[in-house]
Regions:
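Flexible, low-complexity linker and terminal segments
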Residues: 12-29, 33-43, 47-51, 186-411
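Flexible loop/turn segments at secondary-structure boundaries
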Residues: 64-68, 90-93, 114-117, 139-143, ...
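Thiamine diphosphate
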Residues: 1-160, 165-167, 171-172, 385-387, ...
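Active-site/ligand-binding-proximal alpha/beta "capping" segment
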Residues: 164-187
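Broad hydrophobic/π-residue packing in well-ordered secondary structure
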Residues: 8, 60, 71, 100, ...
Length: 411
């Protein structure tokens, strides 16, 4: 039927003008068409396999994240365990429990669900257990626009927990990149024993593109902190940290000699005993922050795209990647000097971010919110960045960004 319709379309003389889309120029390889939710799901499966762990996904159905649950439920042959909970809190709590037992634990949701999960995320952070939290953003607040894209949960991802509770935040920038973003979120969670928030949005989740399938052997193996023996001569210290990553050991229930208590109460460094000591709480608060900031040394550098001799840099994150890249291409072709850089890691920022930003006189930040990354960049790097903001439930078009960036350059 598809071929018949195609043949009819190219032969019928019903139109005054026709336009044939040229075949895409793609590197050689095996391709499949993929959307962001499927790419993200496959990235989680690949991460579990490369870490030699079972994957646990606890979720409550919510648009536009539900398809992750649907996709993962098809892959029990890869030891994927899917759990549809009675509510968002139960889904997150079950995932924390799965992490405690040695699973690559993931919970997924959209904005309203992220708010409900916040206390349980704090528990994972306090217990220092690996957990990936997927937030497929949509229009808000409240029920908002469930089927429309928005990037308005960035500040909540960074700060939406009680107490001093920093955690890594990364963002997928395209449907195919969602695979690698999920893999990276899993790597960080497992290596550093921390919850990680992975941001997607409806545009990435339901958008589609051809994807060159990677070979599983090309993906790096993922390290874990699983321990099977005593880590001191005198016994087991559940919060004796790795000197490089500051991660604590991951002792699984049932391992002889490695019994310990864990929960939401503050713990004593080393022993993990409940502690109300003032100096210890200060140290543990600082240590949890150091652990996250230290990740900046273990992530990709921020790369410049376009004319590096330009005075203007367009900074973006998440699903604005395609529109920004196309707009920069069009402006460069017109002779307008402009470059771009795109954040995947937002907390912490790549360690060369200041170096990149300092090369340019003008910083422009397009976002599908009212300027959340803009505020972060201004605060962190003391630059007078300017925003291009849109909260209409629609993505930026390439032409829209081309026009608005050129206007900002000429101001």
């Amino acid at each position: 039927a598809l071929k018949t319709g195609y043949n009819f379309g190219i032969t019928v003389e019903a139109f005054h003008h026709t336009y044939v889309v040229e075949k895409a120029s793609l590197p050689p390889g095996e391709y499949t068409n993929i959307n962001g939710n499927i790419g993200l799901s496959w990235g989680l499966i690949a991460a579990a396999k490369k870490a030699n762990l079972d994957l646990f996904y606890g979720s409550y159905p919510i648009t536009p994240a539900s398809d992750i649950l649907h996709e993962l439920s098809k892959h029990k042959n890869f030891n994927v365990i899917t759990f549809q909970a009675e509510d968002e809190i139960a889904a997150a709590a079950a995932s924390v429990g799965a992490s405690f037992t040695g699973k690559l634990a993931v919970t997924g949701t959209s904005g309203p669900g992220l708010a409900l999960k916040s206390e349980t995320i704090s528990l994972a952070l306090s217990a220092e257990l690996p957990l990936v939290i997927v937030n497929v953003q949509r229009g808000g607040p409240s029920t908002g626009l469930p089927t429309k894209p928005e990037q308005s949960d960035l500040m909540f991802a960074l700060y939406g927990r009680h107490g001093e509770s920093p955690l890594p935040v990364i963002a997928a920038k395209s449907p195919s990149h969602a695979f690698y973003a999920a893999y990276e979120a899993s790597r960080i969670a497992l290596k550093y024993m921390t919850p990680v928030i992975l941001l997607s949005d409806n545009y990435v989740a339901t958008g589609s593109e051809p994807w060159n399938l990677p070979k599983i052997e090309e993906l790096n193996n993922l390290d874990t902190n699983i321990i099977t023996k005593l880590n001191t001569e005198d016994g087991f210290l559940p919060f004796l940290r790795n000197v490089d990553t500051f991660a604590r050991p991951w002792a699984l229930p049932g391992t002889p000699g490695l019994e310990y208590r864990v929960g939401g109460l503050e713990k004593e460094e080393g022993t993990g005993n409940v502690s109300y000591d003032a100096a210890n709480h200060q140290y543990m608060t600082d240590m949890r922050a150091w652990k996250v900031s230290n990740i900046a040394n273990d992530i990709d550098k921020l790369e410049i795209y376009g004319d590096e001799s330009a005075d203007t840099l367009v900074l973006g994150w998440g699903s604005t990647y395609g529109g920004i890249t196309q707009a920069v291409n069009r402006l460069n072709e017109k002779g307008v000097k402009v470059a771009s850089a795109h954040f995947v890691h937002i907390n912490p920022f790549p360690d060369n971010t200041l170096e990149v930003i300092s090369k340019f006189k003008k910083i422009i930040i397009p976002e599908l919110n009212t300027g959340q990354l803009l505020k972060l960049v201004r605060e962190a790097f003391l630059v007078d960045a300017r925003g291009i903001n849109k909260v209409s439930g629609e993505p930026f078009t390439a032409q829209e960004l081309t026009d608005k960036i050129e206007e900002k350059i000429n101001e």
